[in-house]
Amino acid sequence: MNLEIVSLNKEYNEPWNRFCGESNDAWFWHTTDFVDYKLNFRPALESKSMSFMVKEGKEILCICPLFLEKKDLDNEFVYEFSFGGDYCPAPAFKNGLTESRREEILKLVFSVIDEKARKYDVERVSFRINPLCHNFLES
């Protein structure tokens, strides 16, 4: 089956949040409640959600919270992918994927991010793995 990139929208809030509750990589920062909070956290950043998921059929395999934000660097505006001015949460994967499958999906995720970065002239992106998520604690 083919992998599909789907943008996060209200239609997918429930499955996205359910995925967050099931994935050992996800934490509260990945949920749509926190995404909505961060979108409104610092209005000066003019945050726009670029969050997306990777699906195979009806199954979500990975989610990636991502915002396009405008940052003022000494009166020069640049665009970056961030999360209310902070690091973006690292992509979260479905439990039980093999390492090779995770790598395949991660390559796709970063190719999508690269494509969006070129489209919007993004200067940088930073991700953070939450130290409270299950997979980090178990490593």
Annotate each language-model stretch with its function:
Residues 1-139:
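N-acyltransferase acceptor-side catalytic subdomain
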